[in-house]
Amino acid sequence: MTLKILYLVSKNYHDSKMSRVRFHSMEAVFKKCEGFSYWGPGYSSSRSTWDENLTCQENIDKEFPGVEWDLVVGFKPLGMKDFKDIKYRKCLRYNEMFDKNFTINEIVQSGADLIICHHYNDYIEYKELFSKVKGPKPITFKFVPHSAEQTIFKPIPEIKKTIDVAIVGATNVQTMLGEHYPLRARMVELIKKLPKQYNVKVFPHVGGNHSDAHTDKYAKEFAETINSAKIVITDCGAPKSRFGKYIEIPMCGTAIAGDVYDDEPKDVERLKEFLIEINMEMDDYEILESLVYYIENTAERKFLIHKGLEYTKDFTHEKYAQRFIEAINE
């Protein structure tokens, strides 16, 4: 590819952000480009150091003289001086967009030309919203679904599945939507009611920032945790979003239990082929009965695992990179 893509992000964010999906996915994109680089606050090279007193464009020109970028992708763009005045096409990518005031303000104030939405329900909502608003320039919205890093999230045969049911991810998180992960919060207590012969475990969230997150240590540990369980419970949260765990768990060859997200209709139908569906409308007995059934019935559980592994082949970061490049070229 002859594309040249620059990713502007604070080095502190890059190095310490525990969730690595935003960086793994862009690194997959970079592999398909002729020219690519990270740059932003905290970065330095033999040529220059990012200067907070200079504009984004001035910092870009100083570090990359003569380079004509096809796309500049920004993370937290309003924290960088005059991101809006960058002369190249500007792109923002979003995992969650439930805080509408914040998101709309960031899109408008950053001067973004292209918005990549990782959740289909967000894509539909914001595309419709901005179609009704006349701004200084048109903004293009594209849907590129969440994917996962297949070199990390994969079956690890040497790890025995000694846990029958596990819960992973944040719980008891309050946002403007209320309890952000209602099913997970409920299940923390409910799985304790499973018969005593079953080994159940709640793995607390390790926190959003760690100085060594860039080593992928926490992502690898998370993949090992998933591999240690027969069934892992997650949920789509108050926004009903297709969170990354809906790819990471089945990609590890583990059965996933959770509720059905609101996303692209064909994708939702594929989800139902391998999901052990539990939801807030079910009573405690129904949920526990479903979990026990799939713990005890190995053949049925393995069938779901096989379906999940087949599904996730479409959501590697290699596939993300292909879709991302198609989106920016349309």
Task: Cite the ranges covered by each PLM segment.
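Aromatic/hydrophobic pocket-lining residues that form the small-molecule binding cavity
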Residues: 222, 226, 287, 301
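Amphipathic alpha-helical repeat elements characteristic of tetratricopeptide repeat
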Residues: 216, 284-285, 302
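Residue-level signal for the nucleotide or nucleotide-sugar donor/cofactor binding architecture
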Residues: 244, 282, 315
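Nucleotide-sugar donor-binding catalytic core of glycosyltransferases
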Residues: 2-251, 255-272, 318
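A charged, aromatic-enriched C-terminal amphipathic alpha-helix characteristic of glycosyltransferases
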Residues: 298-328
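Short, contiguous hydrophobic alpha-helices characteristic of membrane insertion segments
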Residues: 256, 274-282, 323, 327-330
